[in-house]
Amino acid sequence: MNKDIFLTNNLNNKKEKFVPINKENIGMYVCGPTVYDNPHIGNARPLVIFDILFKVLKSKYGHDKINYIRNITDVDDKIIKSAKEKNLSISELTNNVIKDFNDDCNYLNLDNPSQQPKATDHIDLMIKMISTLIEKDFAYVVNDHVYFEVSKFDDYGKLSNKKLEDLIAGSRVEVSDNKKKSEDFVLWKPSKDDEPSWDSPWGKGRPGWHLECSAMSKKYLGNVFDIHGGGIDLIFPHHENEIAQSRCANDSKVFANYWIHNAFITMSNEKMAKSTGNILKIKDFKDNVDGQVLKLALMSAHYKQPLDWNEKLLEDCKNTIDKWYEVYLPPKDKIVLDEDILSPLYDDLNTPGYIAKLHQLYDKALKGGNEEKSLFVLACNFIGILNKTKEEWIEFKKKKSSINEDDILEMISLRNKAREDKNYKEADIIRNKLLDKGVLIEDKDGKTIWKLK
């Protein structure tokens, strides 16, 4: 496609035309989960947003031209703490959470990334990078710890657009007598006897969190690549530290050219976070909410804006998809999406704009023929919506309904009998009972038809 892609780049907080380093091999790195607990809806937002970006890049440059890396952090203080609390080994915990995470991604109908590397498979690369930073005098060793010396990197704070002293004052900085200055951050630290550890030139220990992404992005994408993404909470200190250690280790003036960050999901205008217990886990929705409903809800606000999560949002999205399935028709192979349809997504991933476009296409499909219906469904499929057949959608609604089909038909029969007897009060009571159980009825051409809400 000839249309340009525009993205808001947090390096300068401006919307810029996306120009890849090499359009034959575009690199995108997104910070994935730290697998100490199951993902919640707040974690799902970047998964969905960067899946959309992955799809957009593939649509423009080709499916085999995008190298999308989404890492898994499987060594971390939170993991150690969680494993002890749950009386599990580290490997048992991380393997369980990784499996659940992958199941959640399938539930949301996300495209698989090109690679999903685990931190523990790349410890040797991290040790090598630390050694390089020490040799170049950007890092120092104290009591089996290795720290990055922030004052030696002049561009520190550029991504956050803040001075160093402001960043330190406004964040929780690890306090340690080993550091030269409070802003220095750990690259390697010793492990206790019951904690995961690896041999290194500085003794048995494990890497700092920030180093993991620098080592893995270097392996899979090189010293400089196109896009780095994650939640807005990662800008500082995680992404700021990544930039510092990567540029210093690699002697590069750039780490990633475009930095994309999504805003938080809130509940009652408070950030959703595991640390506060203010969370809704993805797995808790699976029995009662179809994944595409959840996905549409996550796309209902622009990724740069906070999204307040509530039951009405979910209900509205379910009703929208229910309506859209009324015109469902498997898309024809020859039909393609033109640039005009995809234009909102090319403009800084404007998902609300794309959803508005889908409503327009639905109206045309409702009045048009098979070609209009196929085009509408294809446009929905592009973002992973209407990916199930109409029969599968109805079957899911039946499973979660508190009433079976035989009971529905029996109640409709009783209602029809009440209407024949002119007992309209009783007929209304039965209608309302069905409605309470999620069943809508309509009298049409002398018959009563029903559908699940």
Swiss-Prot record:
GO terms for cellular component: cytosol. A motif ('HIGH' region) lies at residues 33-43. It is an enzyme of class 6 (ligase). It catalyses: tRNA(Cys) + L-cysteine + ATP = L-cysteinyl-tRNA(Cys) + AMP + diphosphate. It is found in: Cytoplasm. Its EC number is 6.1.1.16. NCBIfam families: cysS. A motif ('KMSKS' region) lies at residues 271-275. Belongs to the class-I aminoacyl-tRNA synthetase family. One of its GO terms (biological process) is cysteinyl-tRNA aminoacylation. This is Cysteine--tRNA ligase. The keyword Zinc-finger does not apply. Zn(2+) binds at residues 31, 213, 238, 242. GO terms for molecular function: ATP binding; cysteine-tRNA ligase activity; zinc ion binding. It comes from Pelagibacter ubique (strain HTCC1062). Its cofactor is Zn(2+). InterPro entries: Cys-tRNA-ligase (IPR015803), Cys-tRNA/MSH_ligase (IPR024909), Rossmann-like_a/b/a_fold (IPR014729), tRNA-synt_1_cat_dom (IPR032678), tRNAsynth_Ia_anticodon-bd (IPR009080). ATP binds at residue 274. The lineage of its organism: Bacteria, Pseudomonadati, Pseudomonadota, Alphaproteobacteria, Candidatus Pelagibacterales. Monomer. Binds 1 zinc ion per subunit. Keywords: Aminoacyl-tRNA synthetase, ATP-binding, Cytoplasm, Ligase, Metal-binding, Nucleotide-binding, Protein biosynthesis, Zinc.
